[in-house]
Amino acid sequence: MSAIVDIIGREILDSRGNPTVECDVLLESGAMGRAAVPSGASTGEREAIELRDGDKSRYLGKGVLRAVENLNTEISEALMGLDAQEQTFVDRTLIELDGTDTKERLGANALLAASMAVARAAADESGLSLYRYFGGSGPMSMPVPMMNVINGGAHANNTLDLQELMILPVGATSFREALRWGAEVFHALKKLIHGQGMSTAVGDEGGFAPNVPNHEAAIQLILKAIAEAGYEPGSQIALGLDCASSEFYRDGKYTLAGEGGLSLSSQEFANLLATWCDKYPIISIEDGMAENDWEGWKLLTDQLGKKVQLVGDDLFVTNTRILKEGIQKGVANSILIKINQIGTLTETFAAIEMAKRAGYTAVVSHRSGETEDSTIADIAVATNAMQIKTGSLSRSDRMAKYNQLLRIEEELAEVASYPGLDAFYNLR
């Protein structure tokens, strides 16, 4: 009854108005699963490759009809009749069918859509919520949200080089409370930005994108918003940064246009980040060095790795082979988990498990181009990842994940826990 009997792929639009892939999987029992894949703006060089049409006459070349065609033909034929309850076998079939390391032949967007939709169909047939289907019946932790309130870099048109400045409600006692704190700070920040005569327009991920003089001015604005919302910076709400450093790393230098064109070596940039961490309650830095600057990553880890979460995104691209190398070299202490960087759920879960075994944290993440699909919320709870990064407190594509987490916490009731600072077990 779990046999796959139909697969339907289609082209839909993401939160930026760009095409992406959606997939429906129908089982013999009548159960159905639907999933849509996200897409990133700043992407790592080693990510699995999404297949785009390149036809400039449609969607500026960003159409995904080729990926959809692959889904409706070759992928459909390979998965037809397989047991949807056997996720690992389904994903292995997809990986072998594509036959490339980067999933470029059939497209990571096509493979991931199938992988996710199969899981949703199997959960539907089992009568289970997706997080229970993935994670079993044991106690589960709700994730600490890393809420992007000020955007810069590739996610906004302003003076900031760093891509995200985030708030982390580590002092809350439940996810529901953490979400409320974040929303209240978001609205306090909006009022402050408006009061200073700056635009309150939001970036791709729902955060504001004000033209502040420099990064410290942005940090200070957030701290003021936290205080005005009635919370204590640090003990109740900490800060996080996503530098996306590969975006401004050229010829061995980190050039910060938002800091007056400052050009820094890896050590100098590490020193700057360390200075900010000493001055402000920053407990997490993502992509603090460029993806190819492994020496810089080692410097940063040696300097800050005991007191700040150092998250590898472009560095690791949710890939166990690269993560293993990072663990062996003592680089970073956390991995960002993006399902479309690797292309199947099985490989995603393997990366989370490898990180945990090594004492690294795993932060489940959205992409800048999102949909109403909320699978990552279920993954964060099912794997006890304890941290999620899914944007600001605006835009329905971001709220879809937060609202799903509210539902999950309600369903789990007393068996749900909110870890707060304990989510950062890599800093013990």
From Swiss-Prot:
An example Gene Ontology CC term for this record: phosphopyruvate hydratase complex
Record-annotated membrane-spanning stretches: none
Main localization, broad class: cytoplasm
Cellular location(s): Cytoplasm; Secreted; Cell surface
One Gene Ontology molecular-function label: phosphopyruvate hydratase activity
Annotated cofactor note: Binds a second Mg(2+) ion via substrate during catalysis.
Annotated binding of (2R)-2-phosphoglycerate, by residue: 163, 338, 367-368, 389
Catalytic activities: (2R)-2-phosphoglycerate = phosphoenolpyruvate + H2O
Keyword Magnesium: yes
InterPro entries (alphabetical): Enolase, Enolase-like_C_sf, Enolase-like_N, Enolase_C, Enolase_CS, Enolase_N
Function: Catalyzes the reversible conversion of 2-phosphoglycerate (2-PG) into phosphoenolpyruvate (PEP). It is essential for the degradation of carbohydrates via glycolysis.
Protein name: Enolase
Organism: Bordetella petrii (strain ATCC BAA-461 / DSM 12804 / CCUG 43448)
